[in-house]
């Protein structure tokens, strides 16, 4: 090996990291120092000297040897790092980290001597599936509830209802109460954050707001003021309020009720642009059944992906999860921007930190799943042909030609390729796995506890003893 050649030694580390131990020859150090001096000389302004004509010693005296060495050292490390990656044919996933720190290296740096540097970086993890074929999962198979059709119709009636004033009676369940209220904690007397409103339309339905709030308004008359002694649920969305007793001063300002339209052909034309009520019901039934079947399929796919991920043996680098978290936050910011919100003022450092913490578990799960699917593709040699991508790309021809914005074709092709491969991998999983379907009978889902800041939904499910097995394997033709 030439005396002035870079010496590179690599050592694998946990969590898919690699340590690079570099020995950088003195010739490289000298060259980078001289190049740094030349670069600074071209832009430095010193009275009595022309640009680019400042003597070396004068320049060093002016900027200081430490500053010069710091600039040169950055160049030395970057140049040697890029060369080391080429020598070892390694593609890093993250920026390199100096083990000893820059200040420590700078303190012992001398252009006349070789320099030893240790850098660490994340690399693509090695993937192994303990098992890919014959995965077995159990899912709860819920039967379609025909009552959901009537519920959908009733919801539609409520949407098209006429709102009429009520003046001659007290409030009852089903009414729309216009209320003002002010809440405070019973123990401290402190006002509740989000617990005050000057005027709010509140549908008087059980389990809306915190327990007892709606019930306390029932039987009130317009103009009445009432004190409600309530307690926040232990699982309330805001941690500071959980389990605390509260006092609400409520005033009933106005009262309205819904006048529901009759279920007839006229209603079908008004609500769904259908000629008859029969046709409307048929359309609603189709939509609900389609959604139901999609949900059932999604449940099965989720179970299969979880099972596959459990077979994955790998060490996921932190940088992959960090990138997924960052992408999730950026997507959230884009949605905010599309809604017309000011992203800069909304996404404070505190909010970004909170989002990063709350989305990290799901981000880690997403990365694990993607790696499991990648491992499956490699193990079973599942690929996407160029013809498949081209065929799918044709579906976007009109969108591309009519778009006012420049579309990144390369990125679009990559997204389409990844989506097609994922679809093919999921189909393969369905065909080569066993799904045990446990039939369940589901009762009505009840919406509960709609507060000013959060809504919770509780669903009760009763299991039956019947169990069915289905083998998701296609017959070979």
UniProtKB/Swiss-Prot annotation:
Pfam families: FKBP_C (PF00254), Trigger_C (PF05698), Trigger_N (PF05697). SUPFAM superfamilies: FKBP-like, Triger factor/SurA peptide-binding domain-like, Trigger factor ribosome-binding domain. Residues 435-477 are annotated as: Disordered. One of its GO terms (molecular function) is protein folding chaperone. It is found in: Cytoplasm. Residues 174-261 form the PPIase FKBP-type domain. One of its GO terms (cellular component) is cytoplasm. This is Trigger factor. It comes from Prochlorococcus marinus (strain MIT 9301). The gene is tig.
